[in-house]
Amino acid sequence: VISDVQFNKIQGLIQKGIDEGATLVAGGIGLPDHLDKGYFVKVTVFANANNSMTIAREEIFGPVITLIGYDTEEEAINIANDTDYGLAGYVSSGDMDHAKDVANQIRAGQVIVNYVGGNSDTPFGGYKQSGNGREKGVWGLHDYLEIKAITGF
């Protein structure tokens, strides 16, 4: 990661996940085993988490994933939307119409369906506390424009 501040923030969140009872599947605190300096974070996976845990509620911005189980699609959508943030989401389905329906219910600036990421033409940006500006594509150009309305002719 970019700095000791971000490294320490991520390390604190990983520790918080452990302290709050999530199952540490991979990774954890500290540098990767083959490194003794730098701001490298171990790829970390938590399972058996719930949406009340800090690691599920914060944008970690590091190689940390929190897995939360669900029983119904409605519950999954509620979990996805029960956050102060909304940068991105992911939907996987063999039925594209159904996937689009689910994606439309997720309050995030970008929802990826059956794909590894967006492309350079799609706008990227968040909802809620993840921000509301857009980068990339035609929407990204709006930040560089000054709009003028002329009325009364």
Question: Predicted segment positions?
Answer:
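Short beta-strand to alpha-helix junction loop
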Residues: 1-11
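Conserved C-terminal structural/oligomerization subdomain of aldehyde/semialdehyde dehydrogenase
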Residues: 14, 20, 33, 37-153
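Cytochrome P450 fold signature focused on the C-terminal beta-domain
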Residues: 23-33
